Amino acid sequence: MDIGKKHVIPKSQYRRKRREFFHNEDREENLNQHQDKQNIDNTTSKKADKQIHKDSIDKHERFKNSLSSHLEQRNRDVNENKAEESKSNQDSKSAYNRDHYLTDDVSKKQNSLDSVDQDTEKSKYYEQNSEATLSTKSTDKVESTEMRKLSSDKNKVGHEEQHVLSKPSEHDKETRIDSESSRTDSDSSMQTEKIKKDSSDGNKSSNLKSEVISDKSNTVPKLSESDDEVNNQKPLTLPEEQKLKRQQSQNEQTKTYTYGDSEQNDKSNHENDLSHHIPSISDDKDNVMRENHIVDDNPDNDINTPSLSKTDDDRKLDEKIHVEDKHKQNADSSETVGYQSQSTASHRSTEKRNISINDHDKLNGQKTNTKTSANNNQKKATSKLNKGRATNNNYSDILKKFWMMYWPKLVILMGIIILIVILNAIFNNVNKNDRMNDNNDADAQKYTTTMKNANNTVKSVVTVENETSKDSSLPKDKASQDEVGSGVVYKKSGDTLYIVTNAHVVGDKENQKITFSNNKSVVGKVLGKDKWSDLAVVKATSSDSSVKEIAIGDSNNLVLGEPILVVGNPLGVDFKGTVTEGIISGLNRNVPIDFDKDNKYDMLMKAFQIDASVNPGNSGGAVVNREGKLIGVVAAKISMPNVENMSFAIPVNEVQKIVKDLETKGKIDYPDVGVKMKNIVSLNSFERQAVKLPGKVKNGVVVDQVDNNGLADQSGLKKGDVITELDGKLLEDDLRFRQIIFSHKDDLKSITAKIYRDGKEKEINIKLK
């Protein structure tokens, strides 16, 4: 959006600023209008409103003017900031440069001032030696030209002279020393002529000399200009004595580069010896050379001497020491700066040339050493390989010789080893078979012990037959099953035998035929029976000593999977003394029993399950463990299609409780609460609604009838009550109710029952006596 005065801004920014401007202006107008309304009447207020609300065109013009002025002010601020930043950068750079070169500038200025003060002494000295110096102009001109070429293109000249000067001789060294001496003489003559001309001009020449000296101290590399001035002068010669002294001063000066810390002492000694000659002073370029290299006393030393590089810290330390030395020796060392600069430059160029030659020789030496070391390594590797091959050949030869000499003995030794291995395997197999036989013998011994116990048990198991076959109305096969069973002699007192068997075996007959294992028979009398436990006790008398009393075990210690033996007389006397083997398949089984054969279960019998073969006639037989002790009495078998070896035995501990009462009382007194019950599972929906049974109740019994003045009536039990829990145990049906009640036949204590009456849950105590 172009708003005039060369200001262009985005359209969105223009609109946003315009909205802000109008909003602020309207707010000010409203504020002014509100204040005017408080001070003037309604008519005046309306006129004021018309004056305050200006034309929209005026608003846009005011906005553009305001925005343009704002942008101009912003541009001015930006330009001022940039100018300030550039100025600050320049100030910082100048301050840095000023600080960086402050030390050198101070020393150079001090040298120039000191040189001006001693111009008179210098002029006198140079006048005395001017004639001798002019005679050597031609020689100095040639050598100075050669030095300029070497300094301008030192890399090229250095590479060309490296091959020629790689091994300098003594004659070459002397030649270089003479050239250096002649160059120093030319430098001194050049400076003498210049100072002589300047001294003739008086005060004007002194100012000119100070400027020349300061320029030379600030710009050391300007050797070409001084050479041109020397070329315009006449040649001079110096005595041989002055050449030697100047060479000694030059050597003393080079010592200062090598020994650093002893520089001041060497210079002071040199000045004392040459007090009537020109003292030496190092310029800035000499400082650079001293910072980068360390040289010997002799500048023309052997070119193989390596140059060592200094670190930044060492260079800074040398600079500081050099500046301090210059300040200390300004009064004595500022005479002939031009001469010293030229002589030092020529010395430095020669030294650099020698160093470049030295570096080239070192490089060639390194290459030669590298090739030599590579060849040596290759030779070593080849020699090692040859030695390895020779060693392998020697080993193979040794093995061949050894085999040719001792092969019969080795064959015999291998045969002996193989024979030993075969015999060891045979003996191990024999020992293994012996161990297996021992194990089998041990098993056979155990089996023999078990069978011995079984044979003893057979002497305690008898056949029990009643006499119902003559007058029984049952079918013959059914009658024979009921008439024949087995019994166990659990106690013997003299000739009196006490035999336990099943109640369904003795039936209703009082007298029973008892047949022993030796086929002798006696008549026994039934002392008592209990249909709820399906047990009966028969008493018989026999003087046969072969009949033995069975050992009683403990049924509370039975273990699932424990081996057992079943001894009985299946199918009568013809198969008496049959022994079958099995294990205990289950514990604490509740087996429903139908005693009266009306297809309705009468009682839950507590028993353990066995898988030994049980057949008709085994009822009342003995279940013994491997020790031959009685642990149970065979009571029932499940006879269903596709069901095999599922038989049940009454635990011997329960048997002992029952037979004790049967011996003395002939019966078992069970508590009778005087109720008749129905199972909840057999109720229909109408009967469930009649007793108001909750839907969550699935198992239990419903009281159908309560005897007057019976234990149930006395306990508060009523018809229609639903019993779901008895003595803390869940009640499934009426068989479970009878089993729990009969389990308290010995203590006859009251038990707690949980019932539902009219749909409400409650607890009552049922009396058992």
Curated annotation (Swiss-Prot):
Residues 126-137, 247-262, 331-347, 365-390 have a biased composition (Polar residues). Residues 1-390 are annotated as: Disordered. It is found in: Cell membrane. It is an enzyme of class 3 (hydrolase). InterPro entries: Chloro_Bact_Ser_Proteases, PDZ, PDZ_sf, Peptidase_S1_PA, Peptidase_S1_PA_chymotrypsin, Peptidase_S1C. SMART domains: PDZ. Residues 1-20 have a biased composition (Basic residues). This is Serine protease HtrA-like. It comes from Staphylococcus aureus (strain NCTC 8325 / PS 47). The lineage of its organism: Bacteria, Bacillati, Bacillota, Bacilli, Bacillales.
